[in-house]
Amino acid sequence: MNLIYFAFKYRYRFKDLNNFLKSRIYGNYILLNFSGPFKYYLSKILILLKIGRAISCDGQPMIRNKSQGYNFFIRGTDLNIPTNLLDLDNNIVAIKHPLLENNKIFQIYPINIKKTKMNDDIKIIFMSSIKLETNEEESLFWETHKEKILSNFAILDDKYFWQNNLANKNLFQINRFYRISKSLLRFEIVTYLKKIYDKKFVLIGEDWRKYWIDSLESNFDTKKNKIIYKGNICLDTGSLEGSSSLYPRANQIIESGGLIVQSYAFDASEHWKDLKQDLLFKNFDELRNIIDKLINNLELSNILLDKIYKHFKNSSISMEETLNRYFSK
């Protein structure tokens, strides 16, 4: 049995790891949670004594080599790895990016999923932050390409779109345009849904109060979030950092028993298989068509929720494959 353990001090990453943070056995691996302000010191002793291998979050503490474990950047891509850690060969990330090779992905799957039913009074839930600060060049880029982007949201994950339109920019500069464009698209999607569904659309995040005063305050309590997601349609416009179907927010929705409706991601075919056509959207028409079918048909919503449960109920096997990729050597 191979020992693997989480080794990080601060609790704010707990919500990003979701059910994967819980101690359990995956095949030949026993995964223990030694994170948090007290257990963290036990993990430091184990690292010092070279017992097992650690997974740290954001390089805190820094794991120096693969024999000790990995530095896991759960909220980002290779572009989020700090410069002082770039030379290490044991950095792994959670999110794919259309402009990168994506050969350091540590894929986490939704596990221990609740088998639930849809609420009788279905709501559309969306939790996120929003920041729309742009400079003149970024605003011009958005206005120039807005019509094309709104007709096909997935174009933002086409590397040739960026290479053709920002050929004079380096990777980090392009990534800033990428993040801003995804934020502006998120705003357009929310605006569209608020107009159509009004009180049925529950918007959560203090940043949104600049635009809609009925937006609810941000909630960082994982247990409360799970209650909110459970049995409702849960909108997921994807990570601003990159394009992955199964990243922290999506996993939390699925594990909570929420019926996820997701913007088409870079790896959608790999993870969603035949469920793509029922849950994923690339434009406003597809989004509205999906939501209209679900919000007005409790039976269909329950059928799809059950399909999601069955699709991921054996994800512990997939999780073992992820661990094998990095810890079998």
Predicted features and spans:
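A charged, aromatic-enriched C-terminal amphipathic alpha-helix characteristic of glycosyltransferases
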Residues: 295-329
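Active-site proximal beta-strand in glycosyltransferases
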Residues: 26-33, 50-79, 83, 87-97, ...
